[in-house]
């Protein structure tokens, strides 16, 4: 419907039509973990879409952490990123997208981890998380020594 008073159109999407449209795009109805769904190919094949997808996944199911450990009597703190999901294809899709951008990640059961400082910096630079808490933590980490003692 065209509005005559302004240069704009009104678009109305009903629930059924919208769901059918999303299904045509390759998305599925229902529990994503039970169905073990990954990221649709049309998203993975477009760099902009895949980056937006990774950003959204990280912002909802990702996090940052400090890995503290001892070596030769000295306590060290290292920074890391993590993405967690019980959906194996989703983890795999997330990892694929990172690899396309040259970011190394390591998996363990339901988690992916990014440990290298350069890769973490690249991650924040490329994917531009909307959760600035993680960016602030990383900057704080960079301003310190990795030794904790």
Residue ranges of model-derived segments:
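Internal intein/HINT superfamily modules and their associated LAGLIDADG
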Residues: 1-149
């Amino acid at each position: 419907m065209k509005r005559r008073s302004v240069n704009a159109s009104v678009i109305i999407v009903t629930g059924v039509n919208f769901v059918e449209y999303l299904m045509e795009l390759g998305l599925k109805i229902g529990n994503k973990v039970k169905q073990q769904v990954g990221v649709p190919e049309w998203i993975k094949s477009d760099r902009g879409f895949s980056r937006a997808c990774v950003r959204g996944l990280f912002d909802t199911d990702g996090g940052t952490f400090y890995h503290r450990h001892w070596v030769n009597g000295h306590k060290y703190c290292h920074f890391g990123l993590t993405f967690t999901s019980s959906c194996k294809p989703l983890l795999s899709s997330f990892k694929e997208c990172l690899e396309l951008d040259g970011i190394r990640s390591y998996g363990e059961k339901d988690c992916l981890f990014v440990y290298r400082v350069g890769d973490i910096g690249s991650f924040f630079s490329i994917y531009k998380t909307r959760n600035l808490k993680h960016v602030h933590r990383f900057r704080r980490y960079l301003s310190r020594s990795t030794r904790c003692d």
